[in-house]
């Protein structure tokens, strides 16, 4: 298990981010998805394969989070191996290449987000099968190396259901055993995490957290 660095969130997840499974973290813009993933990688102590499809990864933000926690920012930056695929085809190649790159020195794989390029291109051709193959590679890596994989997902408005839903909901839902939704609240900096699915924890549990210089913090100030 990898700690999120937030006691209440770890408790919600049954101890933290589990190895050997895909954990989906989804939500609308600026809900803390990237910050959460970066924080988990920062605190993991090992290398992190970070696939950034949206340009949301900030070395400056990582350094700030490390420094705020009394960690060496240079050492933290060196542990993050960044990949920046420009389109869905390059994303496929990047995820495929992880089979040769990621080894036992890595503690986490993050794809942020798994559906950004998929959304852009899905109108032109059916990419659902290809997305499923990419998820299967990530699941294979998680099981082979015994590490967690976090796939960040976007949302879209479903007019039939009249609510926001994760992109490619069924494709990701089929392979992601743990699903966490992040939402904004009216109070600035305050967010809520809702457990939508888990292998052994009850669904529907929620915790509140803050976004600060340190990254993600418990509203009550409790840390692991």
Curated annotation (Swiss-Prot):
Task: Write down the superkingdom of origin.
Answer: Archaea
Keyword field contains Ion transport: no
Q: Name the GO terms of the biological process aspect.
A: DNA recombination; DNA repair
Gene name per UniProt: radB
Q: What does this protein do?
A: Involved in DNA repair and in homologous recombination. May regulate the cleavage reactions of the branch-structured DNA. Has a very weak ATPase activity that is not stimulated by DNA. Binds DNA but does not promote DNA strands exchange.
The Swiss-Prot or TrEMBL record describes its family as follows: Belongs to the eukaryotic RecA-like protein family. RadB subfamily.
Which controlled-vocabulary keywords does the entry list?
A: ATP-binding, DNA damage, DNA recombination, DNA-binding, Nucleotide-binding
Indicate yes or no for the key word ATP-binding.
Answer: yes
Any matching Pfam family: Rad51
Task: Name its species.
Answer: Thermococcus onnurineus (strain NA1)
Protein name, as recorded: DNA repair and recombination protein RadB
Listed InterPro entries: DNA_recomb/repair_Rad51_C, DNA_repair_and_recomb_RadB, P-loop_NTPase, RecA_ATP-bd
Q: List the disulfide bonds.
A: none
**SUPFAM superfamilies, sorted:** P-loop containing nucleoside triphosphate hydrolases (SSF52540)
GO MF terms listed in the record are: ATP binding; ATP-dependent DNA damage sensor activity; damaged DNA binding
């Amino acid at each position: 298990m990898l700690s999120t660095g937030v006691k209440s969130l770890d408790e919600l997840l049954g101890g933290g981010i589990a190895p050997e499974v895909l954990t989906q973290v989804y939500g609308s813009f600026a809900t803390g998805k990237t910050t959460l993933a970066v924080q988990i990688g920062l605190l993991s102590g090992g290398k992190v394969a970070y696939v950034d499809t949206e340009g949301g990864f900030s070395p400056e933000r990582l350094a700030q989070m490390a420094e705020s926690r009394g960690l060496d920012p240079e050492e933290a930056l060196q542990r993050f191996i960044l990949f920046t695929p420009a389109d869905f085809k390059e994303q496929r190649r990047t995820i495929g290449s992880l089979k040769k790159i990621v080894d036992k020195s890595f503690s986490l794989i993050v794809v942020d987000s798994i559906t950004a390029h998929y959304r852009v291109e899905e109108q032109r051709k059916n990419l659902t099968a290809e997305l499923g193959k990419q998820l299967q590679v990530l699941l294979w890596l998680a099981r082979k190396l015994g590490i967690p994989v976090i796939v960040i997902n976007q949302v879209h408005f479903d007019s039939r259901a009249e609510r926001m839903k994760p992109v490619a909901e069924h494709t990701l839902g089929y392979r992601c055993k743990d699903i966490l939704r992040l939402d904004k609240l009216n109070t600035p900096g305050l967010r809520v995490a809702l457990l939508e699915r888990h292998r052994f924890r009850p669904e529907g549990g929620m915790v509140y957290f803050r976004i600060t210089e340190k990254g993600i913090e418990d509203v009550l100030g409790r840390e692991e």
